[in-house]
Amino acid sequence: QLEIKEAQVDEALRRLGGLDGFELEPIVPAAEQWRYRNKLEYSFGSVDGELCCGFHAPGSWSEIVPLEDCLLASERGNEARRVALEALRPLGLAPYDRRAHTGFLRNLVVREGRRTGDLQVRLVTSPGPFDGSSFAEAMVGVGATSVIHSVAERTGETTHGGRDTLLAGSPEIEELCAGLRFSLGAEAFFQTNTEMADVLYGTAAEFAGLKGWERCYDLCCGIGSIGLVLAPNAGEVVGVEIVEQAVEDARRNAALNEITNATFIEGNVRVVLKELAEGPARPDLVVVDPPRSGLARKAVARIAEAAPKRIVYVSCNPTTLAPDAAQLAEGGYRLVRVRPVDMFPQTPHIECVALLEREG
């Protein structure tokens, strides 16, 4: 798997990006091959008239395959899913029909704080009456510290954007990573492999090479993870994120860790970066951690216009890293080094950290 993934990164950068002259470092192997995920999202369905909970069948958005044990989830996470299903079956609630858009039970999201012992169980349903007391009691019985009922009003397959009701415990859980404590709300994005997130963020900090005085922009910052890891060795960190709740989470995480030199701005990266770059405070370093789709071309152009000395690009998709790095090369940057990190064994997904430096 490691050889295949490393070759895929090399091919993407050279073939799709037309890039060369960079150092492709050996892929960092995962600490654990199985049961490494701290979060999994399951879907409800029906088999022979009985409620089930599992994953979509390959290539299908309507068929749900039940499972007894997911080998990427912990034993505790699997137990939480099984007990949740046992608690819901007697209630006679219908699973959501993804063709007819009828039914009630949609998704079950199980998230753990692997290093804190916290456990959050979130039930996602369609609108309608629901007495969640017996469900919450069952979840607390398996150690859940946060039990949430989310109502999704959209017809699409999504666990985001609903109305949340706290059934038991706290609305957030906490996790320890890279020497920091992170508070995670119901919809907060956080790397799903805690052990390898340490490696990923450590690599980003290594590539950043901070001396203690630099101004850093953390773009697509989410809940502030990377920026807060960099902050103790930086002069100033400015995080930019389009999701309002994520910005609130980032500010809360800064306060939780007593970090005072990091600020977070809500807005589109392209727009905010233009405003920041027009001011006197130019960045020395830009860190970007975009979604799988990569960056918009205008956002890449804005980064080049801001003219930081270094860019650290944290990528979850080498096929979008390649064209983004190629566009930055056209804007005066050189791809120096790339280090793949195997965050997700037994899957085709690859994380990379890339360092680009401004030429001249």
What residues fall within each predicted segment?
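Extended interfacial segments that mediate partner engagement and assembly in macromolecular machines
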Residues: 1-97, 115, 129
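Broad gene-expression machinery/nucleic-acid interaction feature
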Residues: 35-41, 50-52, 105-107, 118-120, ...
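Short, low-complexity Ser/Thr-rich regulatory SLiMs
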Residues: 44-46, 112-114, 342, 358
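Short, acidic/hydrophobic/Gly-rich beta-strand patch recurrent on exposed beta strands
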Residues: 54-58, 122, 250
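Rossmann-like S-adenosyl-L-methionine
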Residues: 132-360
